[in-house]
Amino acid sequence: MKLPHIQDQALEGRKPDVLVIGGGISGASIARELMKWKLDVLLAEKESDVAMHASGRNDGEVHPGIDLGKGTLKQHYVIAGNRMYGKICKELDVPFKRCGQYVGMMHWSELLPAYLYACQRKYMCGVSDTRVISGKTLRKREPHLNPDMKFAIYNSMAGSVCPYGLTIAYAENAVQNGAEVALNTAVLSMDVKDGKIRSVLTNRGRIYPEIVINAAGVFAEDVAEMAGDRFYSIHPRRGTNAILDKKAGKLMGGIASWKTLKKTSGHTKGGGIVHTAHDNLLVGPDAVETYEKENFATQASSIENNFKKQQGTVKELSQRDIITYFTGVRAPTFEEDFVIERGRKTKNLIHCAGIQSPGLTTAPAVAKDVAKMAAKMVSVSHPVKKNESYNPYRKGVPRLREMSPEQRNKLIQKRPDYGVMICRCEEISKGEIVDALCSPLPVYTVDGVKKRVRPGMGRCQGGFCMPLVAEIISEVTGQPLENVKKSGGDSYLLFGKTKAGDGK
């Protein structure tokens, strides 16, 4: 485990009702849901920002649950979570598109099995609006899909969201409602006596929580081991995606892949093409077993294989349109299902583990159940009341690129910084960057700003705007420019001034 460089006593002696370990989509959504009660909630995340691992390194698809077996926790929570997405994203002011999913079939011999499969998904598994559509209908909706597709299984409930944007929004709303998010805070060990966690040692002091929620992703098994309650193992699985330039977005408006109904491996998800919430196309991911929990290196073979496979979905796909690529590490158990339950040996522990795809989709529903479980556990020691002042609404930074000329002019007259263009590719203004740095959960790094308002997400990948973003961070925070980091750790952009320090 890569640990933060910070060593201090900022959290020494803290006694929260609930300590949430992990700042991914699971931990952040649970923290927000917990604030519906009058509870002291502390979320500890070892990285310099939330959504730094799997929650910031996935394709952003909101799954309808077509491919999940009945009776699993995954299937139960994906159905419930999918239905909650419209309301959640509206409350948190996060872009969300319910664009539909197409699974194309190449052989007429699979038509009857496809009909039976769609009916089984719809009527037995509760995956609403699952049906078979003709090739003619498919090409009318998505004209660039492979003309060899004879028909497709379609579901209208699939959607696309920005995964790190939603995680940040969850965390910000939790903070707005009174939660504390401690970044650069790693759990090192636990003091467990008589089947109860008495204290949790971090690099920032010892914490004394009433209960602990383990939402630590690939490290959930390590936290469980510290708590003396490990009954599952995580076997990390890498997945690589490529992001295409927005000009390629015209190739498809929804989510698509091609499949065969022949039985394949038990790996979750087989990759596809996603029209993202920000109008790029995303190609992938693949699924490769690994023993390294934090190896986010991207292999050329993964990109090649993803494109080779998905050119069966859209023949016009071209690697020349790639603007960047990334790899995430999933956290499956060997049972390939979620672990959402109270500790079996440790009384004041809740596990939220084994969260792999479709964990982004399931997060709202999982958070609701875990928060109720936690509130009930805390109520054993003292009364827990509803938080009457809870506010579910979070207003994001105004998105200049989505405004009409009239709306832009009105905003610029009120806030001149919104008239200073910093990122040309994504049309991001100085005002948006300043507001991101003044948000409920500000992160004063170039990547922190990038994840919040998208400078550097376009074709040039920050080649033009990165120095300007760094200057704005320096200006807003008052720190020297050479102290500004790209991300966490020692990722400094500069090493000092030139010409004897006068900067000229």
What would you call each of these model-derived segments?
Residues 16-43:
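N-terminal Rossmann-like FAD-binding beta1-loop-alpha1 element of flavoenzymes
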Residues 29, 190-196, 202-284, 288-297, ...:
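Flavin-dependent oxidoreductases
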Residues 36-56:
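Glycine-rich FAD pyrophosphate-binding loop
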Residues 74-79, 107-113, 153-172, 295-301, ...:
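Short beta-strand to alpha-helix junction loop
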Residues 154-211:
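Helical element adjacent to the flavin cofactor pocket in flavoenzyme catalytic cores
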Residues 268, 294-421, 428-441, 457:
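C-terminal catalytic lobe of FAD-dependent flavoproteins
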